């Protein structure tokens, strides 16, 4: 009798487990998967595209050279943006064409340099899910670091390194979780660490090259092409 009752109980338990599994699978199958590109539940929403920039070759006479294609405001196509250069020899950064895009190249610089963009309409909130998306190429062992200029005027560099090993790649930079350091705007050298900087009020955003360029050919340098910033605007 006990064996029979035990067998009946085991059979009922197995049936209930099987039924629960079947119900779970059916419910999961009926739950629609999130559409590609939509936000997953519980995650902070991605900010919208605040600005984008596709650089251009500046006006010049004759064939393109290192001298007549140097970066000025004329390389910027977005009328809402200003380009800023930092470093003793940053003025020799030039525009060039690769893969049918225009990029900025630091190969001829004899000093560290930084390139940033400033939105004339608003400050930038780079907290949370804000992202900088940039098509970049680093050559040899050259690396890039994210740079921000705060509303209080301080230029900061992040400890996150960017390297693409000679390929043009679309790189996304998240600004949270980084350690930040004061960046000397004249020499582009790293100073003291800044703890918890206010990334809710950023004036400029860009990248720094903490070593000089290596010249033409397969040498240490970086190319900076199309760029997009996904962030919330902050009134100036």
Regions found by a protein language model. Give the residues of each.
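Initiator methionine at the very start of the polypeptide chain
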Residues: 1, 29-30
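Intrinsically disordered, low-complexity segments enriched in Ser/Pro/Gly/Ala and basic residues
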Residues: 2-5, 23, 220, 224
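Bacterial N-terminal signal peptides that target proteins for export
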Residues: 2-16
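Bacterial N-terminal signal peptides
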Residues: 14-24
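Beta-rich carbohydrate-recognition modules and glycan-binding surfaces
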Residues: 30-236
């Amino acid at each position: 009798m006990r064996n029979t009752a035990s067998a009946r109980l085991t059979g009922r338990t197995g049936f209930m487990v099987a039924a629960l599994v079947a119900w779970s699978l059916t419910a999961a199958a009926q739950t629609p998967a999130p559409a590609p590109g939509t936000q997953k539940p519980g995650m902070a929403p991605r900010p919208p595209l605040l600005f984008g920039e596709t650089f251009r070759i500046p006006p010049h006479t004759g064939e393109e050279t290192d001298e007549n294609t140097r970066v000025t405001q004329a390389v910027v196509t977005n009328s809402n943006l200003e380009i800023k250069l930092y470093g003793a020899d940053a003025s020799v950064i030039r525009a060039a064409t690769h893969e049918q895009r225009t990029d900025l190249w630091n190969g001829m610089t004899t000093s560290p340099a930084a390139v940033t963009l400033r939105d004339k309409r608003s400050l930038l909130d780079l907290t949370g899910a804000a992202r900088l998306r940039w098509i970049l190429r680093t050559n040899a062992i050259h690396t890039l670091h994210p740079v921000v200029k705060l509303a209080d005027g301080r230029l900061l560099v992040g400890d996150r390194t960017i390297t693409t090993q000679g390929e043009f790649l679309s790189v996304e930079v998240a600004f949270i979780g980084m350690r930040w350091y004061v960046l000397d705007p004249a020499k582009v050298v790293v100073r003291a660490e800044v703890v918890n900087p206010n990334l809710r009020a950023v004036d400029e955003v860009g990248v720094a090259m903490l070593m000089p360029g290596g010249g033409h050919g397969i040498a240490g340098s970086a190319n900076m092409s199309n760029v997009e910033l996904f962030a919330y605007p902050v009134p100036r």
